[in-house]
Amino acid sequence: MIIEVCGMGCPRCQATEKNAIQAVKELGMKVGEDAMVTEIKDVKQISARGVIITPAVIIDGVKVCEGRIPSTQEVKKWIEERKQH
C-alpha cells in the first residue's frame, strides 16, 4: 500500500503525515513494508494528482482527503477500505 501525503512541508502537512504513520502503526502494519508513507512536495506532482488544496492524502492512487488534517481514526478507516479493493 502506498500512502502519499501531498503538501509543502508546512505544520498542517507534517501533522497529516504524522497521523498517517500513526494510523498504519495502530493497524499493526509496518511502515516501509506493509505501507509506504511518502511526502509529495513537488507542485507539479501534487497538481498531477488532482490536488488543489493541501494537505491531501492519496492511498493507492485514490484521493481520500484534501484541504484539512485528517484524524488518525479517519486515516485508519481509509486504509481499511482500500485494503478491501
Predicted feature descriptions by range:
Residues 27-31:
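Alpha-helix termini
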Residues 50-58:
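Structural micro-motif
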Residues 60-85:
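Non-catalytic, surface beta->alpha helical segment in thiol-disulfide oxidoreductase systems
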